[in-house]
Regions:
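Cationic, low-complexity basic patches in intrinsically disordered or flexible, solvent-exposed regions
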Residues: 3
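Basic, alpha-helical nucleic-acid-binding regions used in initiation and control of genome expression
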Residues: 146
């Protein structure tokens, strides 16, 4: 359709526009660039296939819990949500390696880990053994740039509608992420 054709053209233009404004040397076009060679990973690596398969399974359980909240009208989208994962110590230790980036893997505004024994009755049991999920609507303001709901919005005079992460990305050195 005409709409699809127009949207595809816009995506192409935006990719090139972003590419032109990235710092550093690079190929003339995003479509002429090469991908980085990543080191091989296997299931025995600390953050190998087994780790990421488990993270995806946890995310599926979180998505299921968010759908229930969405159906009840408590949240509109995943970035409106904060999530508490009540997990066994083994699962909790594994997920703790992601640090603050757990919320990016889950695509939520907030993510906390807690002991499985502390799970309230309303926490949902999913497919991942040793995990219960509690989703709640975030009370924080929504960042105009990334749409995450963060408590620090309004704390930056030069960017009053942005979260700290976005201020760092817009005016500072840029955030450092390791996993997600």
């Amino acid at each position: 359709t005409q709409l699809q054709s127009s949207a595809a053209s816009d995506v192409y233009k935006r990719q090139e526009e972003i590419w032109e404004n990235l710092p550093g040397e690079r190929a003339a076009s995003v479509f002429l660039s090469e991908w980085y060679e990543l080191p091989a990973s296997d299931a025995s690596d600390a953050m190998g296939d087994t780790f990421w398969s488990c993270c995806l399974a946890v995310r599926q359980d979180v998505n299921k819990a968010m759908e229930a909240e969405r159906a009840q009208g408590n949240i509109r989208g995943s970035l409106d949500a904060n999530v508490v994962l009540y997990a066994t110590s083994e699962l909790r230790q594994m997920l703790e390696t992601l640090g603050d980036e757990l919320r990016f893997v889950l695509i939520t505004s907030g993510a906390e880990l807690a002991d499985l024994a502390d799970a309230p009755a309303e926490a949902l049991v999913g497919h991942v053994e040793g995990l219960k999920v509690l989703v709640s609507a975030s009370d924080a303001e929504k960042c105009d740039r990334c749409w995450h709901r963060r408590d620090d919005i309004g704390s930056f005079e030069e960017h009053p509608t942005l979260c700290g992460r976005c201020v760092t990305n817009v005016s500072g050195e840029g955030e450092v992420r390791h996993y997600a």
